[in-house]
């Protein structure tokens, strides 16, 4: 069973799809931790409603590398095998990406790098 760490900054719609897949047996995984850099993000409430462990890590007034160090500690402390970035609105450090190389997937609603920063229908309309 894959032990997931989910990182998101927005509503967590994809988190709900993952939870549903785990619950119906189509995904052989468990969510060990949900991390957000946005304390107002609904993904944290969604995690709480589904009785999943969650953690807010502020990205204010710290370097990208320090944020990555803090996130890595939380992920490792929670036994994470694989990270899913779903609606995660922060660029991660090179060090973080290298440390989690081959263990991280970014679910992005846009075609990168041309439409970076786009979300939802706005980005789909731009692409079309």
Mark where each language-model region is.
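One-carbon transfer enzymes
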Residues: 1-128
């Amino acid at each position: 069973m894959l032990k997931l760490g989910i990182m998101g900054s927005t509503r967590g719609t994809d988190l709900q799809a993952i939870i549903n897949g785990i619950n119906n047996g189509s995904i052989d995984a468990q969510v060990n931790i949900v991390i957000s850099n946005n304390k107002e993000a609904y993904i944290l409430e969604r995690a709480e409603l589904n009785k999943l462990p969650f953690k807010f890590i502020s990205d204010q007034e710290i370097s990208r590398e320090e944020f990555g160090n803090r996130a890595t500690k939380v992920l490792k402390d929670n036994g994470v095998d694989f990270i899913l970035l779903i609606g995660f609105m922060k660029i991660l450090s090179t060090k973080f990406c290298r440390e989690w190389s081959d263990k991280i997937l970014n679910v992005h609603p846009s075609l990168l790098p041309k439409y970076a920063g786009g979300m939802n229908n706005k980005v789909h309309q731009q692409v079309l």
